[in-house]
């Protein structure tokens, strides 16, 4: 097109300026711009200049709201959303906004159903890498989170946090009917059936119903 007359011979992507021909280095893997401090290499000079701020400490981008300074323009854009409450990257499906583009891409998988991270052990797939890493512990048996009180270990941080309530006595889940408090939300849900009279577990032998599954299992031993 007239607006983008320069074409990459490798992938057909078009550019408005011939100087953008550095894009072809994405295909060749060539990285001619090297940092003199740490020897890290880059495909374009602008990326090198941006990287060098890690070493110089230069922060040329300033927030006009609070004067906080940043090394990169993307960091400033993400920060500005803390003042406005609106991120610069909106989701076209649900209008939710994000401070960073990669967070938008991650969110969009909710709508597309894309799950690019697959477990090599069982084939289960996940939309985010963190989900895969957590899942893999079910195969490796890794339990990196240890209780500081009793040294019991857990595969997930959330499970550790729930366990710690045994030591702290914290009971964050309160029954609205009687005020009784519980460590786990599942315990509260079971308790609330006392007030509601709900008995969702039915014996297939005699039709008797129970509020809790363990009561049904105990009853079934009669038959």
Swiss-Prot record:
Organism for this UniProt entry: Xenopus laevis
Zn-finger segments (C2H2-type): 6-27, 33-55, 61-83, 89-111, 117-139, 145-167, 173-195, 201-223
PROSITE patterns reported in the protein's UniProt record: ZINC_FINGER_C2H2_1 (PS00028), ZINC_FINGER_C2H2_2 (PS50157)
Protein name per its UniProtKB record: Gastrula zinc finger protein XlCGF52.1
GO molecular function: DNA-binding transcription factor activity, RNA polymerase II-specific; RNA polymerase II cis-regulatory region sequence-specific DNA binding; zinc ion binding
One Pfam family from the record: zf-C2H2
An example Gene Ontology biological process: regulation of transcription by RNA polymerase II
SMART domains: ZnF_C2H2 (SM00355)
Entry similarity comment: Belongs to the krueppel C2H2-type zinc-finger protein family.
Localization annotation: Nucleus
Function: May be involved in transcriptional regulation.
Main localization category: nucleus
């Amino acid at each position: 097109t007239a607006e983008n007359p320069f074409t990459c011979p490798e992938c057909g992507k078009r550019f408005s300026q011939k100087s953008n021909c550095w894009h072809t280095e994405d295909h060749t893997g060539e990285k001619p711009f090297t940092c003199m401090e740490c020897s890290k290499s880059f495909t374009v000079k602008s990326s090198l200049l941006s990287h060098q701020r890690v070493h110089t400490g230069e922060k040329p981008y300033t927030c006009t709201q609070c004067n906080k300074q940043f090394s990169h323009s993307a960091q400033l854009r993400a920060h500005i959303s803390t003042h406005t409450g609106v991120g610069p990257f909106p989701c076209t499906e649900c209008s939710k906004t994000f401070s960073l583009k990669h967070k938008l891409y991650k969110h969009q998988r909710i709508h597309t159903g894309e799950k690019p991270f697959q477990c090599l052990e069982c084939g289960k797939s996940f939309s985010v890498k963190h989900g895969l890493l957590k899942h893999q512990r079910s195969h490796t048996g890794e339990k990196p989170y240890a209780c500081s009180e009793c040294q019991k270990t857990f595969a997930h941080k959330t499970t550790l946090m729930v366990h710690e309530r045994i030591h702290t006595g914290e009971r964050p889940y309160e029954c609205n009917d009687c005020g009784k408090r519980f460590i786990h939300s599942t315990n509260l849900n079971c308790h609330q059936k006392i007030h509601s009279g709900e008995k969702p577990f039915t014996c297939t032998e005699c039709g008797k119903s129970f509020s809790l599954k363990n009561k049904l299992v105990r009853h079934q031993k009669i038959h």
